[in-house]
Amino acid sequence: MKQMQGIGQLLWKLREKEGIRQKQLCMGISSLSKYARIEADQQEIDFFLIDRIMGRLGKSVERLTYILPMDVYKIYELRQEVQQKICQRKWEEAEQYLDEYEKNKRAKEPLHRQFIEQERAQIAWLRGESVELVCEHLETAILQTMPEAENQRKTGVLSAEEYKLLLFRWEVCQETEQKRAKDEIKALVEEIFRKNFEKTERVKIIPYAALLISKVIEEGENTIYIKMRTEEALEALRDEGKLLYMPEILSQYIRILEKEQSNADFIEILRQEQKCILEVEHDYNVSFENYRLFEHVIRNFEVDAELIRRTRRASKLTQESLSEDICTQETLARIENGNQ
């Protein structure tokens, strides 16, 4: 294969290292021909698609810096606003942002449709609306990128976000007459813990998996296994400094230790840790409790207009000199303001 440049070369190397075929990696999110062009650096970059491809490879995008057009940057900002309002339990405002998202020309694309539907499912669940409504939104979200979910699970080529959707479906369905099998969640949890996720991706999903597996393993059946998974989740959360799931994992760990009649002083330390986290959430007027689909991602974005302006100024160039023989000064001004 010829030497490639840019993001395509990175994706090719990562895919080859994991032993994943192109067809497996792009199923449900891109045509095979489009993905092949991406690897060959012959396709315009779709930032949201790159996010998901990297996720399916088990890799984090937190170390990538994107230079974005303003319209793409606004979508990322819109997603953040939706999640912030959900954390603040401001349902109506979150719905308004989702309605705004729906009006975007890209809203019908699978990755965007999935985000909109999963957030509507999350809001409905947190608000205590009908389980049927939650499931309706959730199934629509899943189908966007996992049209063959069972076959895709067999390959293990799913992202943390996609695995969370499958876990959430199992949890929600436990409140209906169509409860999903215990064997399904046991298999899902094993798949998740086996997958070669980077630490920053692993922490997004294994705490949720640890919480759900404790619901299906009966008392005395295999408490050692639950304890092991809970400790792995707690360690991951502490190592990455994440709050999502932390109070619930601490609560689960405390119950396990109490049943074992473990050191009372250590249990009290865990209680105080949990209390402090909940106080921080209260002080900042947010709540992560039961917010299963929150995407806690730290990203570096550069808006292309801002980058042009900053680079021009660093080079001590005027708009007039930079635009000479290229465009009018007025056109460059509009570009730098994000209006061109």
Regions found by a protein language model. Give the residues of each.
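Helix-turn-helix/homeodomain-like alpha-helical modules used for DNA recognition
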Residues: 74-127
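A short, Lys/Arg-rich alpha-helix, primarily the initiator
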Residues: 1-17, 290-314
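Flexible helix-coil transition and linker loops at the boundaries of alpha-helical arrays
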Residues: 66-67, 101-113, 127, 143-160, ...
